[in-house]
């Protein structure tokens, strides 16, 4: 499912997933329902995939252009930062900053990352309630042009709790959550 998002941009349909699900002797709808129950993805009111972390089926403030030219949407800032490592590709992330609506650019090239403006930060927050990550956390994990604008946003959203992290911390979080998600373990040699 994640590879399909990365290859095409849009969310896969149940029909797109049927062949892969059949290899495990299950129907795609059953697999998708199980994944949603464990919060690996989120469904809309019609049972369609609206998110398969880190990807969003709908436009968000976190656009990611992959080296292939495919544009995808991430659920949040940390998800966006994890996509290049997860896919092993260069990418350009262009989120719209809350508060200022300024564009921030985070460029992944050959294992190096550049942030513009250099003062940009990520604010990691969540609501003090339970539910799917898409509803509880994703709306608060944002890029900001500076610590000052992150503080302004935090004051405007007291229902979230969290902190500001710098480039290194934010990239490490994205890598930790998604970096090895699509790698497969090699069997031990005898």
Where do the protein language model's features map onto the residues?
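Helix-turn-helix/homeodomain-like alpha-helical modules used for DNA recognition
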Residues: 60-107
């Amino acid at each position: 499912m994640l590879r399909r998002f990365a290859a095409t941009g849009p969310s896969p349909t149940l029909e797109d997933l049927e062949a892969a699900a059949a290899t495990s002797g299950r129907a795609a709808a059953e697999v998708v329902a199980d994944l949603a129950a464990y919060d690996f993805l989120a469904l809309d009111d019609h049972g369609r995939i609206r998110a398969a972390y880190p990807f969003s089926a709908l436009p968000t403030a976190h656009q990611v252009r992959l080296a292939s030219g495919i544009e995808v949407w991430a659920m949040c800032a940390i998800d966006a930062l994890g996509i290049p490592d997860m896919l092993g590709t260069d990418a350009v992330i262009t989120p719209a900053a809350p508060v200022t609506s300024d564009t921030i650019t985070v460029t992944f090239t050959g294992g190096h990352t550049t942030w513009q403006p250099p003062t940009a930060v990520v604010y990691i927050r969540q609501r003090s309630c339970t539910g799917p990550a898409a509803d509880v956390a994703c709306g608060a994990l944002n890029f900001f042009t500076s610590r000052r604008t992150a503080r302004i946003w935090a004051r405007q959203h007291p229902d979230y709790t969290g902190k500001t992290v710098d480039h290194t911390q934010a990239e490490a979080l994205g890598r930790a959550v998604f970096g090895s998600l699509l790698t497969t373990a090699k069997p031990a040699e005898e």
